[in-house]
């Protein structure tokens, strides 16, 4: 392998599960299928539903373990849990944290590890309401990250200030964040002129309601739960939060007039290199 510049983390990249060697001359089919080097060959793909594979007769590392493999897309966490319990599927990835105890026994092989996955709330600075610094501060102070970790992630994580874990040399306390302080958030909003004048629980300012459109997606099991938690906690301080949890989030996100906050989850340093 020849790189255009020194790349000391090359071996890390090659070991990344998302790292692939693809035959670019073969190209990509209309269905999105590529020619790679893995133990299985994709025979059909229905995006968002099902991927069918058959063993690669020319695999470089011995006989693949199965003749055929079917990969199903199951976005709903409860449905995924029941499918594995009933034997409808043989294995699962991305199980909801709340379901972990059901499979941590001798009947299943269960594997999990800490990663650099972080949950983000991206604020849209092209949105008029997000341009108000008081609104941004109130959102940051009004989301109870500790409770989200404890209750919805079942303790599998910790509240983060930055995008990288504490054990990274470029992470930890390099960034500070607002503490959860709903009363302080209320004070900031009131001082900025956001007041509930009609008693409906939603603040207003100059005829505009304190409404934010929260865009997210359902394929990461915890994101819809985060949206509901935020809707509740920000609702307590006078926000109206309108949730749009959709698989079509990417096409919506390119339109800056269609959302105010975009929530996502991603592994920030899968190879140890930011």
What are these regions (language model features)?
Residues 235-274:
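Periplasmic binding protein-like
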Residues 109-124:
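Periplasmic-binding protein-like
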Residues 79-81, 89, 99-100, 126, ...:
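Short, hydrophobic alpha-helical packing/hinge segments within bilobed ligand-binding/sensory domains
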Residues 131-232:
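Append "and occasionally in soluble cytosolic enzymes with long acidic Gly/Pro-rich linkers
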Residues 5-64, 68, 78, 182-183, ...:
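Gly/Pro-rich hinge or "lid" segments in bacterial periplasmic/extracellular proteins
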Residues 101-112, 256-259, 272-274:
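Ligand-binding "clamshell"
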